[in-house]
C-alpha cells in the first residue's frame, strides 16, 4: 500500500535519509546518505528523485558539503534553524534581523570558489 502512495507522489522525502549534521560527516558518509535516498526513490518507483536536502533544527552546515551534494545531483538545501540556534547572518535572513520581520526570505547561491560549484540555499529562521 505504501508503494502505491510513493508511486503516486503522495509520499515524498528529501535528499537524505534523516535529519543529519553534515559537518560531522566525511564526504563518503554524506554521499552514501544521498545515494541511499536516491536508491529508495528508484526502488519504490517515485515519480522523481529529490534534489533538495532538508535540514531542520540546525544552525547551518559547512562549505565542505557543497561538492559531494552537487556531485550527487542535489541542487538545493533548505535549512530550518530553530530559535535556540539562531541562523547565520546570510542574504536569506538579513531582513529578519534588520527589519524585525520573520517572513521575508530570499534564497541565495552558496558557492565553493575553490571547486567552482554552487548550491541554492534557503534558511528558514525559527525552524
Regions from the language model: what does each represent?
Residues 1-127:
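Catalytic-domain carbohydrate-binding cleft regions of carbohydrate-active enzymes
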Amino acid at each position: 500500500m505504501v508503494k502505491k502512495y510513493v508511486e503516486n507522489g503522495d509520499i515524498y522525502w528529501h535528499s537524505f535519509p534523516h535529519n543529519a549534521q553534515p559537518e560531522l560527516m566525511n564526504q563518503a558518509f554524506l554521499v552514501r546518505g544521498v545515494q541511499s535516498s536516491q536508491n529508495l526513490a528508484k526502488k519504490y518507483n517515485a515519480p522523481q528523485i529529490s534534489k533538495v536536502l532538508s535540514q531542520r533544527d540546525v544552525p547551518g552546515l559547512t562549505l565542505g558539503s557543497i561538492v559531494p551534494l552537487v556531485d550527487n545531483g542535489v541542487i538545493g538545501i533548505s535549512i530550518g534553524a530553530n530559535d535556540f540556534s539562531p541562523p547565520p547572518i546570510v542574504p536569506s535572513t538579513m531582513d529578519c534581523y534588520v527589519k524585525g520581520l520573520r517572513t521575508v526570505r530570499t534564497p541565495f547561491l552558496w558557492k565553493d570558489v575553490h571547486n567552482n560549484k554552487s548550491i541554492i540555499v534557503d534558511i528558514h529562521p525559527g525552524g
